[in-house]
From Swiss-Prot:
Keywords: Heme, Iron, Metal-binding, Oxygen transport, Transport. Forms a very stable complex with oxygen. The oxygen dissociation rate is 0.011 sec(-1). It comes from Synechocystis sp. (strain ATCC 27184 / PCC 6803 / Kazusa). Changing H46A: Changes iron coordination. This is Group 1 truncated hemoglobin GlbN. Its cofactor is heme. GO terms for molecular function: heme binding; metal ion binding; oxygen binding; oxygen carrier activity; thioredoxin peroxidase activity.
């Protein structure tokens, strides 16, 4: 059985999606301010590694846990559910723009928007 990672097109597709996703995020007035002082090359690399893991491309993830990675943003910069939803919307819009089939976009939405994932990111 293929993983979501494989169905999306593997490394090449995830890398392209992340690059296009951040182009969109950095234009999104709802969330772009969270990335003002971020090393975007490093951020892209982290996101590529995370999505590879989240979509079943590997069982190893060396990045920080979601709670730890976003704690400062929640506590000091007001990261909230609306921001989380905006990020998810931008990811799904990017995939749609890339021509990813709706059934795969729905699978990505189930992973990206999972309630447990949202709670972890928002430290709830």
């Amino acid at each position: 059985m293929s993983t979501l990672y494989e169905k999306l097109g593997g490394t090449t597709a995830v890398d392209l999606a992340v690059d296009k996703f951040y182009e969109r995020v950095l234009q999104d007035d709802r969330i772009k301010h969270f990335f003002a002082d971020v090393d975007m090359a490093k951020q892209r690399a982290h996101q590529k590694a995370f999505l590879t893991y989240a979509f079943g491309g590997t069982d190893k993830y060396d990045g920080r846990y979601m709670r730890e990675a976003h704690k400062e943003l929640v506590e000091n910069h007001g990261l909230n559910g609306e921001h989380f939803d905006a990020v998810a919307e931008d990811l799904l819009a990017t995939l749609k723009e890339m021509g990813v089939p709706e059934d795969l976009i729905a699978e990505v939405a189930a992973v990206a928007g999972a309630p447990a994932h949202k709670r972890d990111v928002l430290n709830q």
